[in-house]
């Protein structure tokens, strides 16, 4: 009997591209919901394809140690994962963007707000702000 060697699947190629369409939607959300603590000049957007992650989107902070070492201001990157995010309808895409923007703290320090904390649930907050967003657009 022959033994069949299992071949490892080749890793898919991870690709990034600037996501100006996502930037436009996020800036509209920031303005509509008055998220004035967010410095939109230090907010960057990318669309990723080929990722193994099952998330719709992720928020990446620029770590404080790098900020100090390089002498630059805090910054955030919001990455949308094309395989999942692009399949969502427009309302759910906006809800995901609101969720990601809520990870950015009021002091825009380069840290992240976790999903659940004392007296806070980010998912509930995202749903609340999405409803507020929809009301203001009606």
Which role fits each region the language model picked out?
Residues 1-21, 81:
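N-terminal low-structure segments adjacent to metalloprotease catalytic domains
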Residues 24-70:
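Auxiliary, metal-adjacent structural segments of Zn-dependent hydrolase domains
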Residues 63, 77-82:
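Active-site-adjacent structural patch at catalytic or cofactor/ligand-binding sites
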Residues 93-107:
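Active-site recognition of the HExxH zinc-binding catalytic motif
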Residues 22, 93-94, 122:
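Hydrophobic (often cysteine-bearing) scaffold residues that line and stabilize catalytic clefts
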Residues 108-138:
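Post-HExxH zinc-binding segment in Zn-dependent metallohydrolases
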Residues 71-77:
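Short, flexible turn/loop "capping" segments at secondary-structure junctions
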Residues 80-96:
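Short pre-active-site segment immediately N-terminal to the catalytic Zn-binding motif
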């Amino acid at each position: 009997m022959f033994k069949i060697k299992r071949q490892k699947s080749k890793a898919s190629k991870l690709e990034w591209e600037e996501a100006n369409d996502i930037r436009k939607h996020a800036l509209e959300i920031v303005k509509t919901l008055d998220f004035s603590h967010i410095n939109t000049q230090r907010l960057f957007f990318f669309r990723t394809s080929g990722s193994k992650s099952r998330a719709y989107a992720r928020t990446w902070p620029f770590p404080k140690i790098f900020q100090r070492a390089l002498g630059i201001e805090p910054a955030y990157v919001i990455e949308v994962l094309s395989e999942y995010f692009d399949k969502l309808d427009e309302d759910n895409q906006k809800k995901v963007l609101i969720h990601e923007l809520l990870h950015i703290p009021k002091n825009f320090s380069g840290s992240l707000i976790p999903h659940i904390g004392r007296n806070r649930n980010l998912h509930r907050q995202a749903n609340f702000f999405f409803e507020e967003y929809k009301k203001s657009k009606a």
